[in-house]
Design a protein with these regions (language model features):
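Phosphate-coordinating catalytic segments in nucleotide- and nucleic-acid-processing enzymes
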Residues: 3-4, 45-234, 288
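Switch/communication elements of ASCE P-loop NTPase nucleotide-binding domains
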Residues: 1-48, 203-295
């Protein structure tokens, strides 16, 4: 669980410290305030392995974080992300100590000043504003083979969307949520046996993603992540614009999904421009398990 982050000089995000709840954290930010960038920064650090091994050196941290920042933001060099001199400090519940790193404008690599001594299990999942259900399974291969102008988190998301279903049933709150998601879709999300693309099985017939609208495809992503265990207790979910392309019915389903994730022990970071959506999502969570962060 991420406890807090302190930022100075990172892109368009105002300097300051933000403390996070153990459950749902809704980042409410106007256009241009950097909400999406904050999600990608936190996800980059988590993916970098900064809290997954006690044997990593400061140089290893620096190389790993640099690589993830380059993939997530696609800058000319990592120093392009700094306003003069940038400093980031991140506290993690499971790791003892603080991860602190920084870099200056024009720098090729970050410099790690302090790192935690403990470990924190689990890998994050990032759900972007765009639906990616129709990008499986071809996008990760395209990303690796060619220099394409897409964020690295898209590749990561598509990779976990394509992961096989777990043999065990999801935890109780997630099992109930999965049933609700699949009822809304009219069937179970599965892979096409021939090309491994995602389909919805409705009354024995395979419905391709091209026959669903964008909002439904985003629900497909949620159902898939629960079914294959990529959203499970103890992990972290980064969720940009959860209600993008959704009507009021799906927006309520999104709020219910966030509450189920929190109940199952998932830490959720959601970014939105809408105070109304923040109210809806936070209102579904028990007191003390949700927070609103304004940028």
């Amino acid at each position: 669980m991420i406890r807090s982050v302190s930022l100075r000089g990172f892109m368009n995000i105002n300097d300051g410290r933000h403390a996070f709840a153990p459950g749902l954290n809704v980042i409410v930010a106007p256009n241009g305030a950097g909400g999406h960038n904050l999600l990608k920064l936190l996800c980059a650090v988590e993916f970098a392995g900064a809290f997954t091994t006690r044997w990593m050196t400061k140089l290893g941290y620096a190389q790993s974080i640099t690589g993830r920042l380059r993939e997530n933001f696609r800058p000319g060099c990592v120093g392009d992300l700094a306003r003069g001199e940038c400093a980031v400090e991140l506290e993690h519940e499971e790791a003892q100590g603080t991860l602190a790193f920084g870099f200056k404008t024009g720098a090729e690599f970050v410099s790690v000043d302090a790192m935690p001594s403990g470990t924190a299990p689990g890998r994050p999942v990032f759900i972007p504003m765009q639906e990616l259900s129709s990008f499986v399974p071809w996008f990760p291969k395209l990303f690796e083979m060619w220099h394409v102008g897409f964020e690295g988190v898209w590749r990561d998301t598509c990779s976990v969307l394509g992961a096989e279903d777990t043999k065990s049933e999801p935890a109780a709150p997630l099992a109930a949520l999965l049933d609700r998601l699949e009822k809304r879709l009219g069937g179970r999300v599965a892979e096409h046996p021939d090309d491994k693309s995602l389909v919805v099985i409705r009354e024995g017939a395979m419905v391709p993603m091209s026959e669903l609208d964008s909002g439904e495809r985003r629900i497909v992503m949620l159902a898939r992540f629960v079914r294959n265990g990529m959203i499970s207790p103890g992990m972290i979910l980064f969720w940009n614009e959860p209600d993008a392309c959704m009507d009021d019915e799906l927006r309520r389903l999104v709020a219910a999904s966030a509450a189920a994730f929190v109940e199952a022990g998932v830490q959720v970071f959601a970014c939105t421009h809408s105070e109304a959506l923040a109210d809806l999502m936070i209102g579904r969570c028990p007191p003390g398990l949700a927070a609103r962060i304004r940028l």
